[in-house]
Swiss-Prot record:
Membrane-spanning ranges: 11-31, 39-59, 81-101, 143-163, 173-193, 212-232, 237-257, 267-287, 307-327, 334-354, 387-407
Coiled-coil residue windows: none
Species the sequence originates in: Listeria monocytogenes serovar 1/2a (strain ATCC BAA-679 / EGD-e)
Chief place of localization: membrane
Descriptive protein name: Peptidoglycan O-acetyltransferase OatA
């Protein structure tokens, strides 16, 4: 394969600057900053960059030896990636044993899948969403992207070796790579279902291959060790303009794109990959002014440690953020979390990643074994303390990964008991005095909040416009929150029909509603409580509301500590423009009321269920 003049560039500092930009975007996204709701696209930049750099290495190796030396390549990759991630997994499991035992049951499977770099498929097959989950998210969920990269490192060199041996035409080879990337992007479009959680297409190696292959394609036409530092003025201007536009587009995507926007999975992420190609091409070019900007020393420091930063930031954030505050970033907590991430990443870089990458596993452990950090009475006490510490760590890790610790059962019982207290009608009789006291205590706050709930511009004076219709039948359709309030709602609204289902999403309710056609009449009221389990489009919401266009609809908004909360509530607020729809504002009513929620921050305690029903019936009785 003919290539242009070689320039001596084994290290491109601006590439580390680009890594820094990508990892900062990802951290800001996981901290739930409103200005970085699209920060997840930083992972796409990492993918494109990996494809570019690895293919550069392999093509250079082929030019030298007409061989890819796959064994040496894979050993180098394992040295670079495995030690740090294995240490992180062990530390997270041990930390969870002591401080978050309730997550151990699910964490075991996540850890094993992460050890073998198949966590992305593990999350797909176990329906673990990247964008949402009730309760404390898995602290290992960020390892899905490393799983894809490791799978790429195993598969791509073998494919490339076949291509290089059998496809002699470089243009044809480039077309094959581009074609495979386009097939991956089309496959994502085919699999994606609007209004549903996009995690299947987001996690899948098959549906994310276009990111990596975009970088691979760039390596064929833009090898960084062939880029001349001297170019014509016009070419330099093109580089600078294209690079600036691509950076601005990346910033705009980071600030304004949401993970639930359908266009992302219908070509949007492919566009991000193309942006990544342009960013890499311009930032890596020595003639570009962006190359100098991204070689700024602080950016390079972050970039060289970006692997450790990416590894550690997510478990640190998830394990130190209260469930109810996941969508409410705290600037001081965020500063401490970022500081802890950088410190641990630096320790990992100095004492784990760099020594093993340079010296290999055997020499690293041999050197560790031969060093005596603490001598007492001519005895290597430090060595034995180190060995004892390693044994203790492995013992605790083994216990955490086994079923010996039954803490998960206790956590499950706690969550089950929450549901039982809100689902057993008999308990209401025993606790009648308590219920009355609770209602009296909340009466004043209910009045104030309920006035706010029903006097918003879209709902105001709806009942005054027409004579009040006598309601003779009511149906309530919802998810597991509806099951939480069911016994209290039945007591407050006699003869009500309640249809609650765990995990129900709005798209499911559209089908469910067809079975309740008799409630689409002027003397009927319909309560809709949906949005807890995922987002929906306004078209889907309108399809549901259209089925009850003659009935009086009470549409309850949601409080769920997940990213789609604001989008769901915005769609619900827009529906208030319909003359037969009244929005009931549970989001405002439950603000600051942590006692209303179970540990997962979504389902209701007894007090929460009672407050919910009191709010709902107050609005219905107006």
């Amino acid at each position: 394969m003919k290539r242009t003049t070689r320039y001596s560039r084994k290290y491109v500092p601006s590439i580390d600057g680009l890594r820094a930009l990508a990892v900062i975007a990802v951290i800001a996204y996981h901290l739930n900053f409103s200005w970085a709701k699209g920060g997840f696209i930083g992972v796409d930049i990492f993918f494109v960059l990996s494809g570019y750099l690895i293919t550069n290495i392999l093509l250079t190796q082929w030019e030298k030896n007409q061989s890819l030396q796959l064994k040496q390549f894979w050993i180098r990759r394992f040295r670079r990636l495995i030690p740090a991630v294995y240490v992180m997994i062990v530390v997270v499991v041990i930390y969870s044993v002591f401080f978050h035992p309730e997550i151990l049951k699910n964490l075991r499977g996540d850890a094993i899948a992460s050890f073998f770099y198949v966590s992305n498929w593990w999350f797909i097959f176990h329906n673990v969403s990247y964008f949402d989950s009730f309760g404390l998210p898995s602290p290992l969920k960020n390892l899905w992207s490393l799983a894809i990269e490791e799978q790429f490192y195993l598969i791509w060199p073998a494919f490339l070796l076949v291509f290089l041996k059998w496809v002699k035409n470089p243009k044809l080879l480039l077309k094959i790579v581009i074609g495979l990337g386009l097939l991956s992007a089309v496959w994502m479009t085919i699999l994606y279902v609007p209004g549903t959680d996009p995690s299947r297409v987001y996690y899948g190696t098959d549906t994310r291959a276009f990111d990596l292959l975009s970088g691979c394609a760039l390596a064929f036409v833009w090898p960084f060790n062939r880029l001349s530092p001297v170019v014509p003025r016009k070419s330099k201007a093109v580089l600078n303009i294209a690079g600036t536009i691509s950076i601005l587009c990346f910033i705009l995507f980071t600030a304004f794109v949401s993970e639930y926007q359908p266009f992302l999975y219908r070509g949007g992420l492919l566009f991000v990959a193309i942006l990544g190609v342009i960013m890499i091409a311009t930032i890596s070019h020595p003639a570009s002014y962006l190359s100098k900007i991204f070689s700024f020393k602080p950016l390079r420091w972050i970039g060289t440690r970006s692997y450790g930063i990416y590894l550690w930031h997510y478990p640190i954030i998830t394990l130190t953020t209260p469930v109810l505050e996941i969508t409410q970033p705290n600037i001081w907590r965020a500063i401490l979390q970022v500081a802890a991430t950088f410190i641990i990443a630096e320790l990992s870089f100095r004492f784990i990643e760099t020594p093993i990458r340079k010296n290999g596993f055997i020499n690293y452990f041999k050197g560790f074994k031969d060093k005596n950090y603490f001598i007492w009475k001519n005895k290597p006490v430090g060595k034995w303390l180190s060995i004892a510490g390693v044994v203790a760590v492995l013992a605790i890790f083994t216990l955490g990964m086994s079923n010996v610790l039954s803490v998960n059962t206790n956590a499950e019982k706690q969550q089950t008991s929450v549901k039982t207290t809100t689902s057993t009608p008999d308990e209401k009789k025993d606790d009648k005095k308590e219920d009355k006291a609770t209602k009296d205590k909340e009466a004043d706050s209910n009045k104030a909040s309920e006035q706010k709930e029903t006097q918003k511009p879209d709902n105001k004076n709806k009942s005054a416009a027409t004579p009040k219709t006598i309601i003779t039948q009511t149906v309530a359709i919802g998810d597991s929150v509806m099951l939480d309030i069911e016994p209290y709602l039945k007591e407050a609204v006699p003869n009500i029909t309640i249809d609650g289902l765990v995990g129900r999403q709005l798209r499911d309710a559209i089908t469910t509603a067809t079975g309740y056609k008799k409630f689409n009449s002027e003397n009927s009221s319909v309560i809709l409580e949906l949005g807890t389990n995922g987002p929906f489009t306004e078209d889907q919401l309108n399809d549901l509301l259209d089925q009850f266009d003659k009935a009086t609809i009470y549409l309850v908004n949601t409080r769920v500590p997940r990213g789609w909360q604001s989008d769901v509530n915005k769609s619900i607020a827009n529906a208030a423009s319909r003359p037969n729809v009244t929005v009931v504002d549970w989001y405002s009513r439950s603000s600051g009321q942590s006692q209303y929620f179970a540990p997962d921050g979504v389902h209701l305690t007894k007090a929460g269920a009672q407050a919910y029903v009191a709010m709902l019936t107050s609005v219905m009785n107006k």
